[in-house]
Swiss-Prot record:
Main location group: nucleus
GO MF, any single term: mRNA binding
Region (Disordered): 1-37
Matches recorded under SMART domains: RRM (SM00360)
Free-text comment on this protein's domains from its UniProt entry: The RRM domains are required for mRNA stabilization. The RRM domains mediate interaction with MAVS.
Oligomeric and partner information: Homodimer. May interact with MAVS; may regulate MAVS lysosomal degradation.
Family to which the UniProt record says this protein belongs: Belongs to the RRM RBM47 family.
Induction (free text): Up-regulated upon viral infection.
Keyword Disulfide bond recorded: no
Protein name according to UniProt: RNA-binding protein 47
Domain of life: Eukaryota
Protein species of origin: Danio rerio
Amino acid sequence: MTAEDSASAVAMSNPSPSSSSKSSSGHPQHHCTVPEGVAGAPNEAALVSLMERSGYGMVQENGQRKYGPPPGWQGTSPPRGCEIFVGKIPRDVYEDELVPVFESVGRIYEMRLMMDFDGKNRGYAFVMYTQKHEAKRAVRELNNFEIRPGRLLGVCSSVDNCRLFIGGIPKTKKREEILEEVSKVTEGVLDVIVYASAADKMKNRGFAFVEYESHRAAAMARRKLMPGRIQLWGHQIAVDWAEPEIDVDEDVMETVKILYVRNLMIETSEEILRQTFGQFNPGCVERVKKIRDYAFVHFASRDDAVVAMDNLNGTEIEGSRIEVTLAKPVDKEQYTRYQKASKGTAAATTVESTQQSYVYQCDPYTLAYYGYPYNTLIGPNRDYFIKGTVRGRGRAGASSRGPGPRGSYLGGYSAGRGIYSRYHEGKTKLPDKPYEIMSNLELAAVNPVGIKPGTMALPALGAQYPTVFSAAPATKLMEEGKIHPVEHLINPLALQHDPTAASATAAVIPAVSTPPPFQGRPITPVYAMAHNIQRIPAAAASLYGAGYMPIAAHANTATLAALQKNAAVAAAYGGYAGYMPQAFPAATFQMPIHDVYQTY
C-alpha cells in the first residue's frame, strides 16, 4: 500500500464536497454520505461515529476495508518497519473496537481489515503507524491483548515485501541482461540480485530476485509475470513473492560479532578463511564454519568483526568475489517453525545458540543447506515454503490471503533460507531394522499382523528366584547382541552343580507323549544346559533335529533343562502357547520371551 493508494481511498470515501458539511463551529461532520463498505455494515452507526471522531476516511475495496490515512497527511507513506500484523481477531470485531486499542500506543497511519463477502472480518488485519518505535511498542504491549473475554489478539511485525523471485532464467545470463529484460516487461524495477553457481562462478543459479520501488509495483509485476503470460528469452518462468528479509532490532545487531561470507569457491577451506579474516588482528577469529559456498566467521569481539567486514567485503578469495555482512540473528521460536516446515514434520527441534535468544540465519537465497534441487522450485513441487512469523501485505494488489495450503503467510519462495548448521547438525535417524541375535533360531509369525511376545514357563523356580530375571541391556554391536541376551539370562542361574538336585528336577519333567502340532518343523539346535540330566525318552526323539548338541562339560550351569531341552519350551518360540501345559506342572512363573531374545 502506497501513499497514492491511500489518497485515492480517501477520495473514494469522500467523493464530493457534499459528502461532508461544516457545523457552526467550523468542524467537519461526516454524516451526509456513508462510504461504500460501511453502509449496511452490522455496526454502521459505530463506524460512522468513529469516522466523525477521528476525521479518518474509510473505504472497502479488493476484499479489505481501509481506515486512514490521517486527515491532512502529506508526503509519502511511513517507511518499512512501521506496519504490524494483527491475527486471531473475532469475526464480529470491527474498527470501532480495534482502533481505540491500537491508537493507545501510537498514531495510526492506516488500518486494513480483511473482509469476507458476508460482512464479517476474516480474522486478521494490518495496522501501520507513523513511526517505527510505535510499531515495536504495539508488538511488545498488545500481543495477547484480550479484546473479548477469553479472546486474545496475536500481534507481530509485518514486512512490506517489494521483492519477487523469478525462476527459470538461463544460467548463462548476466545481471545486466536480466535487469534489462525484466525492465522491458515490468515497471518500477530498482535492482536485480543474482547469485553465481556454487560449482561454476561464470553461471548463475537459474533464478534471480527483482527489487521494486514499492509493494504495489511488485504486486503488479507479479500479476503480469504469472506463468503462462510472459516468457523471458523463450523460457517459461516461475514467479512468486520472495521471502522478505527479517527486520532485526538495531540493539540486537549491535551485539553481533559473527560475519556471514557468501559466494565462496567450494574448494576454499576453513583454514584459508581463518587466515584471511584473521590477518587484521592475529587470534581474533574464534571459529569458522563453511557450508558449500558460504561460511560463518566467529570473532572474539565485534570491533574485529567490523574491521574485517569493512576490509574484505567485495574482495576476491581464490578468484571469487565475496560478499561479507553481519550475520542476522533469528528468533529461536521462528527458527523452529522454519525447520518444521522445511523438513515437513511437526516434531519440535532442539536449538542451541551462542547468544541468549537467537540463532543465526545464513544465505536467504541459497538452496545449499536444504539440498533441494532447483527443479523443486518450478511447477507443482513447491511444498517446502516456510512459514515465518513476519506477515506479508494484504490483498491490495498482492491478493494474499491467510495461511493457505502451502503453510505460508508470505506466499513466497523461501529461496532456501538456511539456518546456521552449528545449531542443527543432527543426522537423519536411520529406520529401525530388526536383527536375528540367534543365527540359527527361526521365529515364525503365527499372526499375519505381527508377532506377539509369548511366554515360557520354568518349573518350580518362581518361589526360589522371584526377582532373579531381568531384561538384558542393549548392546552396541549386532554381533554382541546375538550372544549377550542369552548369557544374561543364564548367569543368574549359574549355581554349583548338585547331581542329586539335578536328577530330582529331571524326574519332574514328564515325557511328551502326544504329537506336537508343529510336527515336521525341525527345531535345531536344542541344547542341554546341565550334565547328568536325563534326556527326554526316545518316544519324543523325533522332536529333535540333526543338530541336537548336549552340552555336558559346564559345571557351573544350573538345572535349566526346562528352558531349551524340553520340546514344549521350544514350541513356545513358534507361538504355540496351547502346547505348553502338556510339559509343565502348574507351579510355574512366567517370563516374557522378548526379555530373552530381543531384536535391535
